[in-house]
């Protein structure tokens, strides 16, 4: 077995790692030392993190559609949706080409928002990391795990494993915040889970209130559109 050479932290002699090396280490060797090493190696950039999230989301969506074609009503999309998509391969390809890139864009936005809020809170609590480092680490584990969950969702009897995978992802998020910002577990949990969850709850509450206020108006608009679509042209 070949031993990898060790380099002092921050050394410029450490080589940049390929995406496969980074993903594998981030998912299978989650320690503070590992994450700090990944975050301080050459090649760390927000651009690379965004590419990973886009590619991971695209692949995950493609796997989901393939699952619909292979397993039909047993897939996560349900029997009616599965029958509709599986009945037309051409439609499936068009959906993949048109919608999957949009999912990749939303994945990037989600990474930017999550890493941005978590890092802002971490800095306020005395963290020393950067947004780029945190986004890079999060993308390094989130992209492959997203692909994994899509694979698990293809098989009904295995899809139940998505729950422990989700819990594991939450742990990796806390570990990423702690490793990048070099502070305690308590501050890491506060930065990555508690305050972020509070913000999301506030946003959800605001959305619910807005929808409740605008619900009747939105319903009337859709009702008029449906009526116009059902009315034959003169």
Over which residues does each language-model region extend?
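Hydrophobic alpha-helical transmembrane segments in multi-pass membrane proteins
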Residues: 49-74, 92-117, 136-173, 190-214
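N-terminal juxtamembrane cytosolic/stromal segments of multi-pass membrane proteins
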Residues: 1-59
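Amphipathic alpha-helical segments typified by the pilin-like N-terminal helix
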Residues: 210-230
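Short, solvent-exposed mixed-charge patches
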Residues: 232-234
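Helix-boundary and loop/linker segments of multi-pass membrane transporters
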Residues: 37-43, 84-93, 181-182
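Selective transmembrane helix interface/packing segments
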Residues: 2-6, 102-129
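Membrane-interface segments at transmembrane-helix boundaries
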Residues: 23-27, 114-141, 173-189
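Membrane-interface interhelical connector segments
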Residues: 74-92, 125
């Amino acid at each position: 077995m070949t031993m990898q050479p060790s380099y002092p932290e921050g050394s410029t002699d450490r080589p940049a790692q390929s995406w496969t090396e980074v993903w594998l280490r981030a998912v299978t060797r989650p320690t503070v030392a590992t994450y700090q090493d990944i975050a301080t190696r050459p090649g760390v950039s927000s651009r690379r993190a965004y590419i990973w999230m886009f590619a991971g989301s695209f692949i995950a969506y493609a796997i989901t559609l393939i699952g619909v074609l292979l397993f039909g009503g047993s897939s996560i999309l349900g029997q009616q949706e599965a029958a509709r998509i599986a009945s037309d391969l051409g439609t499936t390809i068009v959906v993949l080409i048109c919608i999957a890139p949009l999912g990749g864009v939303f994945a990037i936005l989600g990474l930017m928002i999550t890493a941005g809020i978590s890092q802002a809170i971490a800095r306020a609590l005395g963290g020393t990391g950067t947004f780029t480092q945190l986004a890079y680490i999060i993308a390094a584990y989130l992209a492959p795990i997203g692909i994994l969950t899509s694979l698990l969702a293809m098989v009904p009897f295995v899809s139940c494993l998505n729950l422990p995978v989700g819990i594991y992802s939450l742990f990796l998020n806390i570990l990423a915040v702690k490793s990048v910002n070099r502070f305690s577990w308590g501050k890491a949990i506060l930065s990555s889970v508690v305050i972020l969850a509070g913000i999301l709850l506030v946003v959800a509450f605001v959305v619910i209130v807005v929808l409740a206020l605008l619900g009747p108006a939105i319903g009337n608009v859709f009702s008029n559109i449906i009526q116009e679509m059902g009315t034959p042209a003169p």
